[in-house]
Amino acid sequence: DAQESRGLGDVYKRQDIVFEGFGGVLCVEAGGPTPGIGCAGRGIISAFEKLEELKAFEIYKPDIVIYDVLGDVVCGGFAMPIRGGYAREVFIVSSGEMMALYAANNIAQAIKNFGRRGYARLKGIILNAKNIENEQELVAKAAAEIETEVVMYVPRSGDIQTAENQGGTVSEFVQASPMVKIYQELADKVLEMSEDTKGDE
């Protein structure tokens, strides 16, 4: 990570932390502290502060911004995209495993608390399948308990690992995979459910 090889007081340029991937997608990896030292949540806060300092949003003008944040630790830093007003909608990605659903419930409770203050809203659960028994039923039940819905079912596929081993996405390296269409459908659904995009239609 960049913060591992440099001191926090060193000067960064945008190109040091913003990388362009397949299809013009820009990616920023927040990184984290040395294991056992420091707070990963604080690293996320620092990343937002640095992006603002470098005026990354104003310069790149992204159409859509997605924050991929760990859900099993709901601390102040990990909630930064919500508390800071950066995110309007939250989609929880979960399998049907017990601990994943437990984390999903915690996230839902945190979002509910933030919602009372006018922050982001929970839009639903994206089921990232692990092929466990009765998985769709388990996740549908969990979604109902937190008063939301299953937005989409994403099946487990070895094509994902095949693409990852080549350092890319299925859209780039396994174009014949049915997962390409599934991810396109998921993207369309997320766009359709996102308030910020409705005024641009």
Where would I find each of the regions flagged by the language model?
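Single conserved hydrophobic/aromatic residue that forms the stacking wall/gate
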Residues: 1-12
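Switch I (G2) and immediately adjacent beta-strands of P-loop GTPase domains
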Residues: 13-32
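Residue-level signature of catalytic and energy-coupling elements of molecular machines
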Residues: 28, 47, 68, 104, ...
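Flexible beta-alpha connector loops of hexameric P-loop NTPases
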Residues: 32-42
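Glycine-rich oxoanion-binding loops at beta->alpha junctions
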Residues: 42-46, 50
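Conserved catalytic-core segment of NTP-binding enzymes
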Residues: 53-64, 69-153, 162
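C-terminal boundary of histidine-terminating zinc-finger modules
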Residues: 166-177
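Short, hydrophobic alpha-helical segments
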Residues: 187-198
